[in-house]
Curated annotation (Swiss-Prot):
Reported function: E3 ubiquitin-protein ligase component of a retrotranslocation channel required for peroxisome organization by mediating export of the PEX5 receptor from peroxisomes to the cytosol, thereby promoting PEX5 recycling. The retrotranslocation channel is composed of PEX2, PEX10 and PEX12; each subunit contributing transmembrane segments that coassemble into an open channel that specifically allows the passage of PEX5 through the peroxisomal membrane. PEX10 also regulates PEX5 recycling by acting as a E3 ubiquitin-protein ligase.
Binding site for Zn(2+) 2: C301, H303, C320, C323
Record organism: Saccharomyces cerevisiae (strain ATCC 204508 / S288c) (Baker's yeast)
Gene Ontology process terms (BP): proteasome-mediated ubiquitin-dependent protein catabolic process; protein import into peroxisome matrix; protein import into peroxisome matrix, receptor recycling; protein import into peroxisome matrix, substrate release; protein polyubiquitination; protein quality control for misfolded or incompletely synthesized proteins; protein ubiquitination
Protein name, entry field: Peroxisome biogenesis factor 10
Binding site for Zn(2+) 1: C286, C289, C306, C309
Family classification: Belongs to the pex2/pex10/pex12 family.
ZnF region ranges: RING-type: 286-327
Pathway: Protein modification; protein ubiquitination
SUPFAM superfamilies xrefs: RING/U-box
Cross-referenced PROSITE patterns: ZF_RING_1, ZF_RING_2
Source taxon at top rank: Eukaryota
Transmembrane segments: 25-54, 56-77, 106-138, 146-166, 203-222
Length: 337
């Protein structure tokens, strides 16, 4: 009886020591690229469906939201159901906890499926809203804090990607936060293990290159920040003394006044045939919103669209919607009589 218990304990110890190997960086990137390809097809289908149900204007107004919705659907029907995405099946990967001792829990995978596409979107929206409020209220301190937070996020992302190239553990920050790590769902043969080890070494070379790039990028920022912090009090006291003398005088000369509000602007709508009569009837509709142009604007290639339609389009994709020629928002010209 004692011998049987001893054998059972030894068997359990061996079973607990049996772990699937962690996935390497090239395999994780390969799975991610495959998922991006599938998500791109899904985004295209969702966009076409919204065109049929709503309109082209709706699709042009919410391209980012439609993309997020398609990615959320993809993750909910795969990861959210504790299954695997097509990219993970393609490379034969699955999620485990941070140490690789057990599979990731269902609740964690559901929360991750929501957080992965939605968190970056809401963070970006919040940052843009803060910056917009700062410009309207002219609060310099809050603007500097927002700029600092953006720089801090960029620094964290750079460090995160550098660690990934060296260790190959977490490809996204969301997975690092949730502690969801990839493992192969099969035992690697000797040849496959050697092949993947060679691929990991090549990614480490990229890690060293990225590390050198980040050092050159962030070293001047770090030194200037430390210098400002060391001499900040003295400079602040001097600036307060000097600015208190001529603050009112400078504000009177440097402030910009008389900027009209949006409601005070004169808009041109081509539904009125007296507006820009040289434009023929067949060319007076915007192909983006399928309505008569409002404030007709010209891209560098010469094609005409509504100001708001073309500006929204170029912010997402800097190109002409018709001929795909390069078009930056600052290159758009508004037509006037």
């Amino acid at each position: 009886m004692k011998n049987d218990n001893k054998l059972q304990k030894e068997a359990l110890m061996r079973l607990s020591q049996l772990r699937f190997p962690f996935a390497d960086a090239p395999s994780i990137v390969q799975a991610h690229q495959k998922d991006e390809q599938i998500q791109g097809l899904l985004i295209m289908k969702v966009t076409e469906l919204c065109k049929l149900i709503k309109s082209q204007l709706f699709v042009n107004s919410y391209p980012k939201e439609l993309s997020i919705f398609a990615k959320l659907l993809y993750l909910l029907f795969t990861t959210g159901r504790r299954g695997r995405t097509l990219g993970e099946e393609y490379v034969d990967l699955t999620y485990t906890n941070r140490k690789g001792t057990r599979l990731a829990g269902r609740l964690k995978m559901i929360v991750f499926a929501f957080a992965y596409p939605l968190c970056p979107y809401f963070i970006t929206k919040l940052y843009k809203k803060i910056m917009k409020n700062n410009k309207e209220s002219k609060i310099e301190d809050t603007e500097s804090v927002a700029a600092f937070c953006k720089g801090l996020l960029d620094f964290i992302l750079d460090v995160h990607m550098t660690l990934f190239y060296f260790k190959g553990a977490f490809y996204s920050i969301s997975k690092r936060i949730f502690g969801m790590r990839y493992v192969f769902k099969h035992i690697l043969s000797k040849n496959e293990a050697n092949f993947r080890e060679e691929g990991s070494q090549k990614y480490k070379v990229l890690g060293y290159i990225l590390l050198a790039q980040n050092v050159m990028k962030w070293y001047p920022v770090l030194t200037s920040t430390l210098g400002s912090w060391i001499y900040g009090r003295k400079r602040t006291n001097d600036s307060i003394t000097r600015s208190s003398v001529g603050l009112q005088e400078r504000s009177e000369h440097e402030s910009i006044e008389g900027i009209p509000k949006e409601s005070q602007l004169t808009h041109i709508n081509l539904s009125d045939k007296n507006q820009l009569p040289f434009i023929p009837e067949a060319s007076r509709k915007c192909i983006l919103c399928l309505m008569n142009m409002s404030d007709p604007s010209c891209a560098p290639c010469g094609h005409l669209f509504c100001w708001s339609c073309l500006m929204s389009w170029c912010k997402e994709r800097p190109e002409c919607p018709l001929c795909r020629q390069h078009c930056q928002p600052q290159e758009i010209l508004v037509l006037r009589q």
